[in-house]
Amino acid sequence: PKTIAGGICDGLWGYADDGTHTLNYIRRSEGYALAVSDEEIKAAQIYLAQKEGLFVEPSGAAGVAGLVKSDSGGMIGADSCVIVILSGHGLKDMRVLGEFDIPVIDNDVRELIKIVED
């Protein structure tokens, strides 16, 4: 499949046991796996950068996209403990930067302060 999350989309050639182990862990924990779209991944990547100050690559943001999808689908209980591991620095794949409205300011600390305070 073609996706922006190339780091997690492969055929596991040469390490097929990783997929088997992953499925076993999901089954033992009574968990689940789900698919997320490139748009959901980009939305998670942008959210993480803008709201949390974390710039992760698309593969790293896929877990947050899955969390959002699971929550909106009612799959996460109010008393659930959820952990999402974020990996892969955003500089590995910077395509999402085109989605940001990045302000350009003069070389003046007062302009920077204004941007930060807004």
Question: Which residues fall in each region the model found?
Answer:
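Active-site/ligand-binding loops adjacent to catalytic centers
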Residues: 1-55, 99-118
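Glycine-rich beta-alpha junction loops
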Residues: 8, 12, 39-40, 60-62, ...
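Substrate-binding/catalytic subdomain of NAD(P)-dependent oxidoreductase enzymes
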Residues: 26, 41-46, 54-72, 80-81
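Phosphate-binding loop/pocket of nucleotide- and phosphate-handling active sites
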Residues: 1-2, 62-118
